[in-house]
Amino acid sequence: MHSQPYLLSPTPNTPFPPAEHALHEPNGLLAIGGDLTPQRLLAAYRSGIFPWFTEGQPPLWWSPDPRTVFHSDNIHLSRRFRRSLRTSTWTVRADTMFAAVIDACASTPRRGQDGTWITANMREAYLTLHQHGYAHSVEVFDGTMLVGGIYGVAIGRMFFGESMFSTHNGASKIALASLAYFLHTHSVPLIDAQVENQHLLNLGAERWPRRDFLTSVRRLITQTELPACWSVLFGEKLSRDLV
C-alpha cells in the first residue's frame, strides 16, 4: 500500500504508475503533476485513470475503488419520466456543439459543489481531444436552444464519461440515455461514470471492483474505434423515441 501519490514528470511520455497503486484515502488518488496533452490524457484513460482537480491545483490523477460504471443497455428511466417524453419535442444530436456542452458543464450550478473542476486548461485539453476525434458530446435541444448534454472520451469500444448538465428538468437524463442507446447499438458496452453519487446509482450505475473495471478497459480499448465524428452516424433523434 502506498501512503503518498506519485509525482509525475512534465515529460508527456512519462508512464503512469499502475492504477492499483492508488491511495485508499483519498480514495483513488494515484498521481500528481504531469500535463494535459492528448498523449497524457489518452494514456490515462487507457490505464483506467482520469484527471480531476480545481483551479490552482496541479493535475491530480485518480482511479477509485470501487469504480462507477453503466452498462450501455441498462439506463434506468422512471415510468413517470418516460410518460413525460411521449409529448416531448426535444431533439438530440451528437458532436455538433462540443464546446458549448463543455462550457455549460463548467458553468451550470450543482448542488453541493462550489465552483468547477473544468478549468480553462482542462477545457482546452478536451477541445483538442475532440479535434483529434476522441472526445465527443451528445446534445439535447429545445428548438434551437441547448438545454442538456454530456461529453466524454471514446477509445476503442469503451466510453469514459466526464460530465453532463441540464438547464431544463430531465435534459441530462435524455442526453445520457441517448448516448447509451447509441453506444449499445454500436457495440460499446460500458460507460465509465468515475465516482458514484446517488443520482448516477438511481439511473442504473453499478459499483465495480477496480480490478474488474481495469480488466474490461484493457479488453475494450483494443477494439475497433468508432468514427472520429459522430454527427452523421448519430443523426438527429426525437427525445420521445426513448420511450
Swiss-Prot record:
GO terms for cellular component: cytoplasm. It is an enzyme of class 2 (transferase). InterPro entries: Acyl_CoA_acyltransferase, Leu/Phe-tRNA_Trfase, Leu/Phe-tRNA_Trfase_C, Leu/Phe-tRNA_Trfase_N. Gene3D superfamilies: Leucyl/phenylalanyl-tRNA-protein transferase, C-terminal domain, Leucyl/phenylalanyl-tRNA-protein transferase, N-terminal domain. The keyword ATP-binding does not apply. The keyword Transferase applies. Its EC number is 2.3.2.6. GO terms for molecular function: leucyl-tRNA--protein transferase activity. Its main location: cytoplasm. Keywords: Acyltransferase, Cytoplasm, Transferase. Residues 1-22 are annotated as: Disordered. It catalyses: N-terminal L-lysyl-[protein] + L-leucyl-tRNA(Leu) = N-terminal L-leucyl-L-lysyl-[protein] + tRNA(Leu) + H(+); N-terminal L-arginyl-[protein] + L-leucyl-tRNA(Leu) = N-terminal L-leucyl-L-arginyl-[protein] + tRNA(Leu) + H(+); L-phenylalanyl-tRNA(Phe) + an N-terminal L-alpha-aminoacyl-[protein] = an N-terminal L-phenylalanyl-L-alpha-aminoacyl-[protein] + tRNA(Phe). It is found in: Cytoplasm. Belongs to the L/F-transferase family. Functions in the N-end rule pathway of protein degradation where it conjugates Leu, Phe and, less efficiently, Met from aminoacyl-tRNAs to the N-termini of proteins containing an N-terminal arginine or lysine. This is Leucyl/phenylalanyl-tRNA--protein transferase. GO terms for biological process: protein catabolic process. It holds the Pfam family Leu_Phe_trans. It comes from the Bacteria.
